[in-house]
């Protein structure tokens, strides 16, 4: 049987097949578009729902505390400004990462627990790897100079008494990344040019006195400050920090040039009724703080304010008896310092405590650690005739979760200043709202609210 295929049959068949193919292709494209549309719709709905849920969580839980504090600031009859805090823990983690010390610390702890590392061999002043400025904290906020509002990030420092700012005339390399004060741009500038030079172990600062409008929050007053024209040393601490200068909140007797404190000058010029300021550090937000000038914002604390008389007008310093387990020090000099991230105690006092508390110093590092559940750790007490101020272990321990989940850093360190001198830094101020009263020569303490 012969099979004959004509050209028209081939053409007709091809046309029919092409029609079927096109119909199939259109149907497939329609289905694909429908699926794509459904996927887009599903993703859109998911994003909207997730966004709405996230907004609800942040608005009602995360931002709730910020809203409370912002409301207090806006409605307060006093001037309150917020400031940022870079604490020792943040710098510790950065240093450990840079020097790749994580495993070294973990292995050191293991050796200590096995009794293979003796306490007497845990380092000394000859340690060759230092955790830089472990005891320092940067509490920096904004203030303005001049009638044109030149902005600067200042370290608010209760143990310093001058205002220092980088000058446009500064020739040092470390000044390059900073904001500079330019007197030529301010109509309220008053020339002084008295030379200033400060020398310390960390370095030398040279500069000149100037006078201009100084503004914090809602308060402004003409005030004498120091323009830094040359900075030698203080590196890499200064150039790597977000701080431009220092805003001293101490006493006149501590200042260069015998300058009245900024807060006192505000009262002298009738800008505020009381020469007083306070510091509030939220207990659960370790990167924020608040400075209130001219009065006491009662919404930042609970219970009564207890006042202690200063033992002289050089530092914010009082006489308190210090007790730490079986170790004690009578009538100790206790200084409040907003630029200290830890509690400092004399070395002799610290060593007596360490002997019985299972605290371990990591070899060749200025780092003291212990297990977070250490039951031998006592409550640290500061006693006055009328009040006892306490810090429990949970308030002076910092979990080192990025190194070892059960390991904590001790925020109490041995530093020898003047005889029998202790410093209350960040851990104490997280628990206690603190008041600094120039008028009555006192400091006040109250339990800080967890806002």
Swiss-Prot record:
Indicate whether Zinc-finger appears among the record's keywords: no
- Where in the chain are disulfide-linked cysteines found? 170-175, 372-408
The annotated consequence of residue 160 to A reads: Slight reduction in catalytic efficiency towards a synthetic peptide
Q: In terms of pH, how does activity behave?
A: Optimum pH is 5.2. Activity decreases sharply at pH above 6. Optimum pH is 5.5-7.5.
> Membrane-crossing residues?
38-58
* Domain spans labelled Peptidase A1: 139-446
What is this protein's name?
Plasmepsin III
List the ranges whose topology is Cytoplasmic: 1-37
What EC number is given for this enzyme?
3.4.23.39
Q: How does it sit in the membrane?
A: Single-pass type II membrane protein
Pfam families in the record, alphabetically?
Answer: Asp
Is the tRNA-binding keyword given for this protein? no
Alphabetically list the UniProt keywords. Answer: Aspartyl protease, Disulfide bond, Hydrolase, Membrane, Protease, Signal-anchor, Transmembrane, Transmembrane helix, Vacuole, Zymogen
Positions of the propeptide removed during maturation:
1-123
Can you tell me which family this protein belongs to? Belongs to the peptidase A1 family.
Subunit relationships: Probable homodimer; in the zymogen form. Monomer; in the active form. Acidification disrupts homodimerization. Component of the hemozoin formation complex (HFC) composed of falcipains FP2A and/or FP2B, plasmepsins PMII, PMIII/HAP and PMIV, heme detoxifying protein HDP and falcilysin FLN. The HFC complex is involved in hemoglobin degradation and detoxification of heme in the food vacuole during the asexual blood stage.
Relate the protein's function as given in its record. During the asexual blood stage, catalyzes the cleavage of denatured host hemoglobin (Hb) or globins. Digestion of host Hb is an essential step which provides the parasite with amino acids for protein synthesis, and regulates osmolarity.
Q: Which organism is it from?
A: Plasmodium falciparum (isolate 3D7)
Per the record, what are the reactions this protein catalyses? Hydrolysis of the bonds linking certain hydrophobic residues in hemoglobin or globin. Also cleaves small molecules substrates such as Ala-Leu-Glu-Arg-Thr-Phe-|-Phe(NO2)-Ser-Phe-Pro-Thr
For this chain, the Swiss-Prot or TrEMBL PTM comment says: Proteolytically cleaved into the soluble active mature form by cysteine proteases in the digestive vacuole of trophozoites. Proteolysis requires an acidic environment. Transprocessing may serve as an alternate activation system.
Q: Disruption effect? A: No growth defect. However, slight decrease in proliferation and slight increase in doubling time during the asexual blood stage in an amino acid-limited medium. Triple knockout of PMI, PMII and PMIII causes a slight decrease in proliferation during the asexual blood stage in an amino acid-limited medium. Quadruple knockout of PMI, PMII, PMIII and PMIV causes a decrease in proliferation, an impaired proliferation in an amino acid-limited medium, a reduced formation of haemozoin and an abnormal accumulation of endosomal vesicles inside the digestive vacuole.
């Amino acid at each position: 049987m012969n099979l004959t295929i004509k050209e028209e049959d081939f053409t007709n068949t091809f046309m029919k097949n092409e029609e079927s193919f096109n119909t199939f292709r259109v149907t497939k494209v329609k289905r694909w578009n429908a699926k794509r549309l459904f996927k887009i719709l599903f993703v859109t709905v998911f994003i909207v729902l997730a966004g709405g849920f996230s907004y609800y969580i942040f608005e009602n839980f995360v931002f709730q505390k910020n809203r409370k504090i912002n409301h207090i600031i806006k409605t307060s009859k006093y001037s309150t400004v917020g400031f940022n805090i870079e604490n020792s823990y943040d710098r510790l983690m950065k240093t450990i990462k840079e020097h790749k010390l994580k495993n070294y610390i973990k292995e050191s702890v293991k050796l200590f627990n096995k009794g293979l590392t003796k306490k007497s061999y845990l380092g000394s002043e000859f340690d060759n790897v230092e955790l830089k400025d472990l005891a320092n904290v940067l509490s920096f906020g904004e203030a303005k100079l001049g009638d044109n509002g030149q902005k600067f990030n200042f370290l608010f420092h209760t143990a310093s008494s001058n205002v220092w700012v980088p000058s446009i005339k500064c020739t040092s390399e470390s000044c390059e990344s900073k904001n500079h004060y330019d007197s030529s741009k301010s109509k309220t500038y008053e020339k002084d040019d008295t030379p200033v030079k400060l020398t310390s172990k960390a370095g030398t600062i040279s500069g000149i006195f100037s006078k201009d409008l100084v503004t914090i929050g809602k308060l402004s007053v003409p005030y004498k400050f120091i323009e830094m024209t040359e900075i030698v040393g203080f590196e890499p601490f200064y150039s790597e920090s977000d701080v431009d200068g220092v805003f001293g909140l101490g006493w006149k007797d501590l200042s260069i040039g015998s300058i009245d404190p900024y807060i006192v000058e505000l009262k002298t010029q009738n800008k505020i009724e009381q020469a007083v300021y306070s510091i509030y550090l939220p207990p659960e937000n370790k990167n924020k703080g608040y400075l209130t000038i001219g009065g006491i914002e009662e919404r930042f604390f609970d219970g009564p304010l207890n006042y202690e008389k200063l033992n002289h007008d050089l530092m914010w310093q009082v006489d308190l008896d210090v007790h730490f387990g079986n170790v004690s020090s009578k009538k100790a000099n206790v200084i409040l310092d907003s630029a200290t991230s830890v509690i400092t105690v004399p070395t002799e006092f610290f060593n007596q405590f360490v002997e019985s508390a299972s605290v371990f110093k990591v070899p060749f590092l200025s780092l003291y650690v212990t297990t977070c559940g250490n039951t031998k750790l006592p409550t640290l007490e500061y006693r006055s005739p009328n009040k006892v101020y306490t810090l429990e272990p949970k308030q002076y321990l910092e979990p080192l979760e990025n190194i070892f989940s059960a390991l904590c850093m001790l925020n109490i360190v041995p530093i020898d200043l003047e005889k029998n001198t202790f410093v209350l830094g960040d851990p104490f101020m997280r628990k206690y709202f603190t008041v600094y009263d120039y008028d009555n020569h006192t400091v006040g303490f109250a339990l800080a609210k967890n806002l």
